[in-house]
Amino acid sequence: MNIRPLHDRVIVERQEVESKSAGGIVLTGSAAEKSTRGTILAVGKGRILENGSLQPLDVKVGDTVIFAEDRGTRAEKIEGKEVLIMSEFNIMAIVE
C-alpha cells in the first residue's frame, strides 16, 4: 500500500528504543519510553502560505529526525510497521 501525506505532513517510521535500563533491568509498560526519533518515509508537497504560494518542506525522504511526541502525532499501522503521520512543525531537528 502506498500512502502520500498531504500539504506539510510527513510519514515517519519510529526507531526502536533500548528496552533495558543502564543497570540491565528490562523496562516494560509505562517505564519503557517510546522513541522520539525516526526516519522520514514520505513527505507532502509543502505548506500553502497565505499568499497562495507553496513552501517546500525542509525534510526529505530518508532523513533521520527528532520529533515532539506530545504534539498531535497519530500512530498508524502500515504493512506491519508503526508509522506516525505528523506536520513538519512537530519535527524539532534533523540528525546529520
From Swiss-Prot:
Alphabetic keyword roster: Chaperone, Cytoplasm
This protein's record includes keyword Cytoplasm: yes
A biological-process GO annotation: chaperone cofactor-dependent protein refolding
GO MF, one example: protein-folding chaperone binding
CC per GO annotation: cytoplasm
UniProt cross-references to InterPro entries, sorted A to Z: Chaperonin_GroES, Chaperonin_GroES_sf, Chaprnonin_Cpn10_CS, GroES-like_sf
Cellular compartments annotated: Cytoplasm
Leader sequence segment: none
Pfam families associated with the record: Cpn10
Domain of life: Bacteria
Subunit structure: Heptamer of 7 subunits arranged in a ring. Interacts with the chaperonin GroEL.
Recorded family membership: Belongs to the GroES chaperonin family.
NCBIfam families hit by this protein: PRK00364.1-1, PRK00364.2-2
Reported function: Together with the chaperonin GroEL, plays an essential role in assisting protein folding. The GroEL-GroES system forms a nano-cage that allows encapsulation of the non-native substrate proteins and provides a physical environment optimized to promote and accelerate protein folding. GroES binds to the apical surface of the GroEL ring, thereby capping the opening of the GroEL channel.
Name this polypeptide is given: Co-chaperonin GroES
Organism the protein comes from: Vibrio atlanticus (strain LGP32)
